[in-house]
Amino acid sequence: MGFAPLLVFSLFVFAGTTKGFICSFDSIYQLGDSFSDTGNLIRQPPDGPTFCSAHFPYGETFPGMPTGRCSDGRLIIDFIATALNLPLLNPYLQQNVSFRHGVNFAVGGATALDLSFLAARGVQVYDVHSPLSTQLKWFRTYLGSICSSPKECSNKLKNALFILGNIGNNDVNYAFPNRSIEEIRAYLPFITEAVANATREIIRLGGTRVIVPGMFPLGCLARNLYFFPDGDKDDLGCLSSLNDLSIYFNSLIQQALASLRIEFPQAVIIYADYYNAWGFLFRNGPALGFNSTTMLKCCCGIGGPYNYDPDRECASQGVPVCSNPTEYIQWDGTHFTQAAYRRVAEYIIPDIIKELKCSYSSIQHLTEGREALHINERE
């Protein structure tokens, strides 16, 4: 699978590498897909309210009702906001809410590539109208509402953190039908270019600190395991060929970010290693509190070895939900549980904080308070 071995993080070691620096973020701007969407998809006419994330049991763990998050509760972006002592981001399409501390532009089902690009190559995308280019348009519109000149905009964004993704897995999923792995692989450079161009635009508009997550292991998703029952499996039961796609895409993204760092030396551009973060989780799940018998099974779903049936999805009538989502990694076959997102956040946040040169004191609440992340539980 190519996952990194079990890693041990110590807050005491981490503190020593960052002492003397202060994190001064006053806002976060998130672009991406359903792994980051906090409520935009369900507010898009005409079909928004019909999407599953608008219905229970989505949101059952937090906040106790559906919010548009494709999970039982919080997402990685929520834990990042909490770690930086900022409020959870409101979705761009929600009315009468505050955007003082940032905006979430991510939309469930979004692609990195424009829909016209995909359509020209025979890739059909249904019910999705807000690819990455649309989210950038929203950001430009928002920016125009808070500043009127490049200098003023740069000043407004000087203490902002941008997170671009993860995004790109939908481009791959939509292209799967009737295409070989080799054909899908040929799409990845185009997806990489779209992400790189979006990063470039964010920096040109005034962003100076940008996180670009990589792709998670596609071969471990219950949905993909359902659709490729005869695929080659690794020792964890994940599809090796699909995970190889993720690895290849991540190598392309890292190369693109290296070039962007040369192009924009004034910016801090961080690669977030989602692949190994999720790999850590799948490989060490039982030690982290997850049930060893349900690692690849859905908490909310029905049927088959993975508790997943695309014709009877989570939130559909008669589809059950597990009573213990904290013991499951997978939520609905395509997305993950709050418990899983929390653990991935634990994995990536220390590296992000270190690269952003934040002080230990600025992340004390990672291990204190009611929303503690307990990074040191790996020890």
Swiss-Prot record:
Please list the tissues where expression of this protein has been recorded: Expressed in roots and leaves at low levels.
Residues with attached carbohydrate: N96, N178, N197, N291
Free-text biotechnology note from the record: The strictosidine aglycone-producing AJM7-DeltaHYS yeast strain expressing pathway genes of the VOM module, RsGS, SBE (GsSBE, RsSBE1 or RsSBE2), RsPNAE, RsVS and RsVH, accumulates vomilenine. Additionnal expression of pathway genes of the AJM module, RsVR, RsDHVR, AAE (RsAAE1 or RsAAE2) and RsNNMT, leads to the production of ajmaline. Ajmaline is an anti-arrhythmic alkaloid commercially used as an efficient drug for the treatment of arrhythmic heart disorder.
Q: Which residues form the signal peptide?
A: 1-20
Name the keywords, alphabetized.
Alkaloid metabolism, Glycoprotein, Hydrolase, Signal
Q: In which pathway does it act?
A: Alkaloid biosynthesis; ajmaline biosynthesis
The protein's annotated catalytic reaction(s) are: 17-O-acetylnorajmaline + H2O = norajmaline + acetate + H(+); 17-O-acetylajmaline + H2O = ajmaline + acetate + H(+)
Keyword Protein biosynthesis included in the entry's annotation: no
Q: What does this protein do?
A: Acetylesterase involved in the biosynthesis of ajmaline-type monoterpenoid indole alkaloids (MIAs) natural products, important plant-derived pharmaceuticals used in the therapy of heart disorders. Deacetylates 17-O-acetylnorajmaline to produce norajmaline. May also catalyze the conversion of 17-O-acetylajmaline to ajmaline.
Homology family: Belongs to the 'GDSL' lipolytic enzyme family.
Q: What is this protein called?
A: Acetylajmalan esterase 1
Show the taxonomic lineage: Eukaryota, Viridiplantae, Streptophyta, Embryophyta, Tracheophyta
Name the gene that codes for it.
AAE1
